[in-house]
């Protein structure tokens, strides 16, 4: 099992897919990394040599923001939006959809489970 950017890559998968287990690397970025390092995308992780693993590790560390650094940057961006009090920041603070989706009947993922309000009975 190869360890790159603090993530154990699954050894039975192709390296092109295995790199996507790293936060911040998708299929397109994975292909770019493999092309830059000259590693065969169809090779399995268990078949990689130490030299290829170190090339991949070096390429990712020097040219891409991944895992903890990327998570910190995203959190800082959201914190900044909240601090300046813009519309997007307010939506983040209230836990509502940020990108203009309707909230009257949907948005359950952002709003969480329904808070049912009990109806008051009329006393006799």
Swiss-Prot record:
<keyword id="KW-0694">RNA-binding</keyword>
<dbReference type="GO" id="GO:0005829">
    <property type="term" value="C:cytosol"/>
</dbReference>
<dbReference type="InterPro" id="IPR018269">
    <property type="entry name" value="Ribosomal_uS13_CS"/>
</dbReference>
<dbReference type="GO" id="GO:0006412">
    <property type="term" value="P:translation"/>
</dbReference>
<keyword id="KW-0699">rRNA-binding</keyword>
<dbReference type="InterPro" id="IPR019980">
    <property type="entry name" value="Ribosomal_uS13_bac-type"/>
</dbReference>
<dbReference type="InterPro" id="IPR001892">
    <property type="entry name" value="Ribosomal_uS13"/>
</dbReference>
<dbReference type="InterPro" id="IPR027437">
    <property type="entry name" value="Rbsml_uS13_C"/>
</dbReference>
<dbReference type="GO" id="GO:0015935">
    <property type="term" value="C:small ribosomal subunit"/>
</dbReference>
<keyword id="KW-0689">Ribosomal protein</keyword>
<comment type="function">
    <text>Located at the top of the head of the 30S subunit, it contacts several helices of the 16S rRNA. In the 70S ribosome it contacts the 23S rRNA (bridge B1a) and protein L5 of the 50S subunit (bridge B1b), connecting the 2 subunits; these bridges are implicated in subunit movement. Contacts the tRNAs in the A and P-sites.</text>
</comment>
<dbReference type="GO" id="GO:0019843">
    <property type="term" value="F:rRNA binding"/>
</dbReference>
<comment type="subunit">
    <text>Part of the 30S ribosomal subunit. Forms a loose heterodimer with protein S19. Forms two bridges to the 50S subunit in the 70S ribosome.</text>
</comment>
<protein>
    <recommendedName>
        <fullName>Small ribosomal subunit protein uS13</fullName>
    </recommendedName>
</protein>
<keyword id="KW-0687">Ribonucleoprotein</keyword>
<dbReference type="Pfam" id="PF00416">
    <property type="entry name" value="Ribosomal_S13"/>
</dbReference>
<dbReference type="GO" id="GO:0000049">
    <property type="term" value="F:tRNA binding"/>
</dbReference>
<comment type="similarity">
    <text>Belongs to the universal ribosomal protein uS13 family.</text>
</comment>
<dbReference type="GO" id="GO:0003735">
    <property type="term" value="F:structural constituent of ribosome"/>
</dbReference>
<keyword id="KW-0820">tRNA-binding</keyword>
<dbReference type="InterPro" id="IPR010979">
    <property type="entry name" value="Ribosomal_uS13-like_H2TH"/>
</dbReference>
<feature type="region of interest" description="Disordered">
    <location>
        <begin position="98"/>
        <end position="124"/>
    </location>
</feature>
